[in-house]
């Protein structure tokens, strides 16, 4: 299975924050083929290890995706919900969803007051998620409950993976099944040869709601160095200034120098030196980023224990946190090469 095939399979799985079971199970079965040990910690993180000597390097990718959770069922069987993770409300209206009921999965659609019944001033306003609902076809509260829906039932977005042109893919949860796919492919390649370091491949939980799993797993592993794998915003489409997001699809993985204007991660200089040297040695094109917006698992990892030298390598993506994220397959493959060779060279830098 190639890294692209891994991504296609992972994207189709459903696993919002705190409900990553199906993603974890798939990754566990794959990593058991390539690693010396695989375990699930008390928090739900998946921790696989390869090698028993040399420096400890932690490679982390979060398994969770954004989603919804049912908080109320009205008398007519419509579901009101809260958001799990960072969602911009207009991107979810009229989308198809999967409601993961106790009796099996149900298809639903997100609805709201139709524009035909809105006043003119209403049409100019953004429809907030509080004014949306999920329609599962139930005709009463009792029927919705009988179908297996309860308070706390989790909901994920329904979206297939499609090829866009020659080199692009679109689908849901590329944030961060992209990182998970890279993690699996890297460990598969490492399984075919001897290594002189200890590699911890970690599928973290609950990144989208506070970087929680990364903090717990990093404390347990206490690595010498860590790299978080994620996506970052590509600014190569209309509506965004190049200076605000100078990252393009198809030009290679992105190395984060700073994110959240320094409130998140300030990447350790030794990690940046390693990535730069490896990219030059193996002729891997990379992009460099100083970010002002969000952050990644790297923020939690680098503040663990006495501090862990940490960096982040991302795959550029368009339309992050929507059901139609877009990435370039070439960036995915180059990210595998970069991470793989960083692991091979880690003892030369730490």
UniProtKB/Swiss-Prot annotation:
Gene Ontology BP term (one): proteolysis
Binding-site residues for a divalent metal cation 2, renumbered to this chain: 175, 208, 321
Residues given in the record as a divalent metal cation 1 binding sites: 62, 175, 230
Keyword Magnesium appears in the UniProt entry: no
Molecular function GO terms recorded: aminopeptidase activity; metal ion binding; metallopeptidase activity
Catalytic-site annotation from UniProt: 207
EC number(s) recorded for this UniProt protein: 3.4.11.-
Organism whose genome encodes this protein: Methanocaldococcus jannaschii (strain ATCC 43067 / DSM 2661 / JAL-1 / JCM 10045 / NBRC 100440) (Methanococcus jannaschii)
Protein name: Putative aminopeptidase MJ0555
Keywords, comma-separated and alphabetical: Aminopeptidase, Hydrolase, Metal-binding, Metalloprotease, Protease
Note describing how the cofactor binds: Binds 2 divalent metal cations per subunit.
């Amino acid at each position: 299975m190639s890294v692209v095939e891994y991504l296609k399979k992972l994207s189709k799985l459903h696993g919002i924050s705190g409900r990553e079971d199906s993603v974890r199970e798939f990754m566990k079965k794959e990593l058991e083929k390539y690693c010396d040990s695989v375990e699930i910690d008390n928090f739900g993180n998946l921790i696989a290890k390869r090698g028993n000597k040399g420096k400890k390097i932690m490679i982390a990718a979060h398994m969770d995706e954004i989603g919804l959770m049912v908080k109320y069922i009205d008398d007519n069987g419509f579901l009101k919900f809260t958001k799990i993770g960072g969602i911009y409300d207009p991107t979810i209206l009229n989308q198809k969803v999967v409601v993961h009921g106790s009796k099996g999965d149900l298809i639903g659609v997100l609805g709201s007051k139709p524009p035909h019944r809105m006043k003119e001033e209403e049409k100019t306003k953004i429809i907030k998620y509080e004014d949306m609902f999920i329609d599962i076809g139930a005709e009463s509260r009792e029927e919705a409950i009988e179908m297996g829906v309860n308070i706390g039932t989790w909901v994920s977005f329904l979206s297939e993976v499609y090829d866009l042109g020659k080199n692009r893919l679109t689908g849901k949860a590329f944030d961060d099944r992209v990182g998970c796919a890279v993690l699996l492919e890297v460990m598969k390649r490492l399984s075919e040869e001897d290594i002189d370091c200890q590699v911890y491949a970690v599928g973290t939980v609950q990144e989208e709601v506070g970087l929680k799993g990364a903090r717990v797993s990093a404390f347990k592993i206490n690595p010498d160095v860590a790299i978080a794998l994620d996506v970052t915003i590509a600014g190569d489409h209309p509506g965004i200034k190049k200076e605000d997001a100078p990252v393009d699809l198809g030009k290679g993985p992105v190395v984060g120098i700073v994110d959240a204007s320094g409130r998140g991660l300030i990447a350790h200089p030794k990690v940046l030196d390693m990535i730069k040297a490896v990219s030059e040695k193996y002729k891997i094109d990379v992009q460099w980023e100083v970010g002002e917006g969000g952050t990644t698992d790297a923020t939690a990892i680098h503040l663990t224990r006495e501090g862990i030298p940490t960096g982040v390598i991302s795959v550029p993506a368009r339309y992050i946190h929507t059901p139609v994220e877009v990435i370039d397959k070439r960036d995915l493959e180059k990210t595998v090469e970069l991470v793989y060779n960083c692991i091979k060279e880690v003892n030369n830098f730490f």
